[in-house]
């Protein structure tokens, strides 16, 4: 990752992407380097974590890295949930399904954004008024009654629900 540091001109290191600085990217790459020095894969590192769900496992591994929500915070952890969905689910369209050994789709948490939260409130899938991880877990639990082996299957339906309203 040190090559990455030296390749970016000093005057261009303030902002790397949106809310992240060059230093943030270097910290993330540094943590990945540590993980890959200790484990054969990120999947193996997550398997070694004692936390109960995949999002907590990612938060544990990347604790202290800017852009990774802290455990117990108010974030819905949408990016982490989305990343895990891409890596675990095997729909052949959007999700890569690269990780086949550590997690099962039934363990995933729905990637929760404002739109999906509002639709979930409207449909009675949650009573939570704020989009937090607790809310995402509640919606995922509700969806698990419809899609027991893959609650995130309902994500596309919720995301697209009402999209053409008013047209």
Q: For each of these PLM feature ranges, what is it?
A:
Residues 1-167:
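HhH-family (HhH-GPD) DNA N-glycosylase catalytic core used in base-excision repair
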């Amino acid at each position: 990752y040190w090559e990455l540091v030296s390749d970016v001109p000093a005057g261009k290191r303030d902002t790397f992407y949106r809310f992240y600085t060059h230093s943030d990217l270097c910290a993330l790459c540094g943590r990945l380097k540590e993980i890959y020095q200790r484990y054969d894969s990120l999947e193996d590192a997550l398997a070694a974590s004692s936390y109960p769900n995949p999002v907590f496992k990612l938060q544990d591994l990347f604790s202290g890295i800017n852009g990774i929500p802290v455990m117990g915070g108010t974030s819905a952890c949408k990016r982490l949930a989305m990343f895990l969905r891409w890596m675990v689910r095997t729909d052949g369209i959007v999700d890569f399904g690269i990780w086949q050994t550590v997690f099962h789709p039934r363990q995933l948490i729905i990637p929760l954004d404002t739109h999906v939260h509002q639709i979930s409130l409207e449909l009675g899938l949650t009573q939570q008024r704020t989009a937090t991880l607790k809310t995402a877990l509640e919606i995922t639990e509700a969806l698990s009654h419809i899609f027991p082996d893959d609650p995130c299957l309902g994500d596309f339906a919720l995301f697209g629900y009402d999209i053409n309203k008013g047209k």
